[in-house]
Swiss-Prot record:
<dbReference type="GO" id="GO:0000978">
    <property type="term" value="F:RNA polymerase II cis-regulatory region sequence-specific DNA binding"/>
</dbReference>
<keyword id="KW-0238">DNA-binding</keyword>
<dbReference type="GO" id="GO:0034605">
    <property type="term" value="P:cellular response to heat"/>
</dbReference>
<keyword id="KW-0539">Nucleus</keyword>
<keyword id="KW-0805">Transcription regulation</keyword>
<feature type="region of interest" description="Disordered">
    <location>
        <begin position="300"/>
        <end position="343"/>
    </location>
</feature>
<dbReference type="GO" id="GO:0005634">
    <property type="term" value="C:nucleus"/>
</dbReference>
<comment type="function">
    <text>DNA-binding protein that specifically binds heat shock promoter elements (HSE) and activates transcription.</text>
</comment>
<feature type="region of interest" description="Disordered">
    <location>
        <begin position="476"/>
        <end position="501"/>
    </location>
</feature>
<comment type="subunit">
    <text>Homotrimer.</text>
</comment>
<feature type="compositionally biased region" description="Low complexity">
    <location>
        <begin position="1"/>
        <end position="13"/>
    </location>
</feature>
<dbReference type="InterPro" id="IPR036390">
    <property type="entry name" value="WH_DNA-bd_sf"/>
</dbReference>
<dbReference type="Pfam" id="PF00447">
    <property type="entry name" value="HSF_DNA-bind"/>
</dbReference>
<dbReference type="GO" id="GO:0003700">
    <property type="term" value="F:DNA-binding transcription factor activity"/>
</dbReference>
<feature type="region of interest" description="Disordered">
    <location>
        <begin position="243"/>
        <end position="275"/>
    </location>
</feature>
<keyword id="KW-0010">Activator</keyword>
<dbReference type="InterPro" id="IPR036388">
    <property type="entry name" value="WH-like_DNA-bd_sf"/>
</dbReference>
Length: 527
C-alpha cells in the first residue's frame, strides 16, 4: 500500500510538479530577507523612478530636493507603476509610502517627503525602516490576500479615497483642513449669493408695488373717463371753461395793446386798471411854451415904460449884429464898452446907465420902431448882471436910479475918438446940412428869432419930429452934439435929486467939464 501510495503520491507530486512548473520557476526559492545594511527594494525602486529625468513630467523631485511630487497620478499609475512595481494601483503605492513613514507635504498636490529620502543621497535609504503592523502576524497573513484582491480591482477604482485613507493620520488631517477651507469658500459664496438674492427680492418687491400703483391709477383714469363719457354736461362745461380761458388770454393781450395806444394818443384818458397817469409833455414842447410866456411878460412892461416917459430912451454903445454901419435912431442903455485895444472894462459894481432922447424921423415905420424896442429890451436885459447881481427889471430903471461912476473910471473906458462913446459907427451917421438923418431901413430888419407884437407898437408914443424946438436948439447949438448931450445930462441930473450916497451935483459938473475937455481935444485932433 505504501509503495503504491508513495508511488501514487510521487506521481501526484510529479503531476502537480509538471502542472505547476511555470508558477514555481520565477521563485524557485524564497526571497532572502533584506539585511540590515541593504535598503528595502520598494524604496530603491521609488528612488530610481523619481531620479529618472525622463519621467520628470510625471514624477520628479521638488525644488527643495527633500521630497518628490507626482504631477500626473493617472499617467503615473498607468505607465510607471506597472514598470517598477508590476501593478497600476496608485492607492497601493501611497499605502506603501505610509508604511515607510512618508508624509504628505502639500494638501493640494501629491507631494511626499521623508527625512531619509533626499536627492543625491541614496545611501540614506538604509535609515528608513518599515513600520510594524498594529494587528500582528494575523494581519501579515491577510495582507498578501488583500494585496491580491487589490490587484484584481480595476485601475482607478476608489483611488482618491484609498489614498486619503492609506496616507495615514497625517494625510487625513490635511484632507480635513483642505475640506474646511473649501467649505469656508463655499460658505462665503453662499452668503454673497444670499445677499444678492435679498437685494433682488427687494427690487422685485419695489417693481411690484410700482406696477400695482400704475394699475390703480390706470383703473382710476378709466373710471373717470367712463364717468365723463356718460355725463355730457360735464364735457360741455369742460369745453366751455377751455374756451373761456382762451378768450380771456386773447382779451388780455388785446387790452395791453389798446392801453399803450390810448396812452400815446390821449394822455388824459384814465388807464383800464384804475391808475391815474399824469401827462408829462416832452422837454421841447415845455421849453417852447416857457419861452413864449417869458417873451410876452418881458416885452410888455418895457415898451410901456419907454412910451410913458419921454426921457426913457437911453444912449449906449450896443454892439451891432452886422458889420454894416448905418444911422439908427434907437434908445438903448449905456452899458459897458467892449475892449477894442486892451482897455479895462467897466466894473460890475459900478455899471453906468444914462438916459437921454435922440431924434427920430417921420420916416420910421412901425416895423422899425419894433426893431428899436427889441434892441432896447435886449440891451436892458444884458445890463441886469452888471448891476450888483440884483434882480432888477429893465423897464423900471430911470434916471434917478442910475449910478454915475467917477471920471477916473470913465477915462479908462472912453476911447480917444468921440464917436466911439455914443456908438456913431454902430447907430449914427454924420448929420446932413438940412438937419435930417439918413436911416438904413435894411439894417433894421428883424431877426428870425424875434417875435413881434403889433399891438405893443401902437402903444408907443410918437417921437418928436424934426421941427420941434428941442431939435432946433440941438441943431443950432454951436457946440458939438456930444457937448449938448452932456449939458442935457447935467441939467437932468441937477433937477432930479439922487439918493445913492454921492454928491450928484458935484460929480455931474466934474463929469461935464471933463467930457467937454475931452471933446475939445478930439476936435483938435480931427482938425
Amino acid at each position: 500500500m505504501e509503495p503504491n501510495s508513495s508511488g501514487s503520491g510521487k506521481a501526484a507530486v510529479g503531476d502537480g510538479g509538471g502542472g505547476g512548473a511555470p508558477m514555481l520557476q520565477p521563485a524557485p526559492a524564497p526571497a532572502p530577507m533584506p539585511s540590515a545594511n541593504a535598503p528595502p527594494p520598494f524604496l530603491v525602486k521609488t528612488y530610481d523612478m523619481v531620479d529618472d529625468p525622463s519621467t520628470d513630467k510625471i514624477v520628479s523631485w521638488s525644488p527643495t530636493n527633500n521630497s518628490f511630487v507626482v504631477w500626473d497620478p493617472p499617467e503615473f499609475a498607468k505607465d510607471l507603476l506597472p514598470k517598477y512595481f508590476k501593478h497600476n494601483n496608485f492607492s497601493s503605492f501611497v499605502r506603501q509610502l505610509n508604511t515607510y513613514g512618508f508624509r504628505k507635504v502639500d494638501p493640494d498636490r501629491w507631494e511626499f517627503a521623508n527625512e531619509g529620502f533626499l536627492r543625491g543621497q541614496k545611501h540614506l535609504l538604509k535609515s528608513i525602516s518599515r513600520r510594524k503592523p498594529a494587528h500582528g502576524h494575523a494581519q501579515q497573513q491577510q495582507q498578501p490576500h488583500g494585496h491580491a484582491q487589490q490587484q484584481m480591482q480595476p485601475p482607478g477604482h476608489s483611488a482618491s479615497v484609498g489614498a486619503c485613507v492609506e496616507v495615514g493620520k497625517f494625510g487625513l488631517e490635511e484632507e480635513v483642513e483642505r475640506l474646511k477651507r473649501d467649505k469656508n469658500v463655499l460658505m462665503q459664496e453662499l452668503v454673497r449669493l444670499r445677499q444678492q438674492q435679498q437685494s433682488t427680492d427687494n427690487q422685485l418687491q419695489g417693481m411690484v408695488q410700482r406696477l400695482q400703483g400704475m394699475e390703480l391709477r390706470q383703473q382710476q383714469m378709466m373710471s373717470f373717463l367712463a364717468k365723463a363719457v356718460n355725463s355730457p354736461g360735464f364735457l360741455a362745461q369742460f369745453v366751455q371753461q377751455q374756451n373761456e380761458s382762451n378768450k380771456r388770454i386773447a382779451e388780455g393781450s388785446k387790452k395791453r395793446r389798446i392801453k399803450q395806444d390810448i396812452e400815446s394818443q390821449d394822455p388824459s384818458v384814465t388807464p383800464a386798471d384804475g391808475q391815474i397817469v399824469k401827462y408829462q409833455p416832452g422837454i421841447n414842447e415845455a421849453a417852447k411854451a416857457m419861452l413864449r410866456e417869458l417873451s410876452k411878460l418881458d416885452s410888455s412892461p418895457r415898451l410901456e415904460n419907454f412910451s410913458n416917459s419921454p426921457e426913457s430912451f437911453l444912449i449906449g454903445d450896443g454892439s451891432p449884429q452886422s458889420n454894416a454901419s448905418s444911422g439908427r435912431v434907437s434908445g438903448v442903455t449905456l452899458q459897458e464898452v467892449p475892449p477894442t485895444s486892451g482897455k479895462p472894462l467897466l466894473n460890475t459894481a459900478s455899471a453906468i446907465a444914462g438916459q437921454s432922447l435922440l431924434p427920430a424921423t417921420s420916416e420910421m415905420q412901425s416895423s422899425h420902431l419894433g426893431t428899436c424896442s427889441e434892441i432896447i429890451n435886449n440891451q436892458l436885459s444884458n445890463i441886469i448882471p452888471l448891476v450888483g447881481g440884483e434882480d432888477l427889471h429893465p423897464g423900471s430903471l430911470s434916471a434917478s436910479d442910475m449910478i454915475m461912476p467917477e471920471l477916473s473910471q470913465l477915462q479908462g473906458i472912453l476911447p480917444e475918438n468921440n464917436t466911439d462913446v455914443i456908438g456913431c459907427d454902430s447907430f449914427m451917421d454924420t448929420i446932413a446940412v438940412e438937419g435930417k438923418m439918413g436911416l438904413d431901413i435894411g439894417s433894421l430888419s428883424p431877426g428870425a428869432d424875434i417875435d413881434w407884437q403889433s399891438g405893443l407898437l401902437d402903444e408907443i408914443q410918437e417921437f418928436p419930429s424934426v421941427g420941434d424946438p428941442f431939435w432946433e436948439k440941438f441943431l443950432q447949438s454951436p457946440s458939438s452934439p456930444d457937448a449938448a448931450m452932456d449939458d442935457d445930462i447935467s441939467n437932468t441930473s441937477e433937477t432930479k435929486p439922487q439918493i445913492n450916497g454921492w454928491d450928484k451935483t458935484q460929480n455931474m459938473e466934474h463929469l461935464t467939464e471933463q467930457m467937454g475937455a475931452t471933446n475939445i481935444k478930439q476936435q483938435k485932433h480931427m482938425i
